[in-house]
């Protein structure tokens, strides 16, 4: 399969997911705190090459791939490559430099469920959302429990 076709398939999947994510958000009103980028600084977040294929292809088409390879080779921190902190002092606040091309993990975090060790669905979110949006977090858990997390 040609690379263009793979990129189109990933982008089509992301478009469908965005519809479902927006539906979940409209039911729960859950969202990341404005400017929070704490998860973008965690070195143990797993992401696959496939979920960043559209971004890599975008870099290639815009003659930025070589420059990015050099940047990656000289990188000294473990932040997500797309993350741009607002401050050198507190790297936990910032934003995605290319939101359209963010990975699947970035799209789903806080807006999806995963199975716990008992096989039960649980809201996949962070401590910051749990503490700052307690009522909404409870609502999100309720939506998941009642299967109100998928578009019909």
Region roles according to the model:
Residues 1-38, 42, 46-152:
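Short loop/turn segments that flank or connect secondary-structure elements
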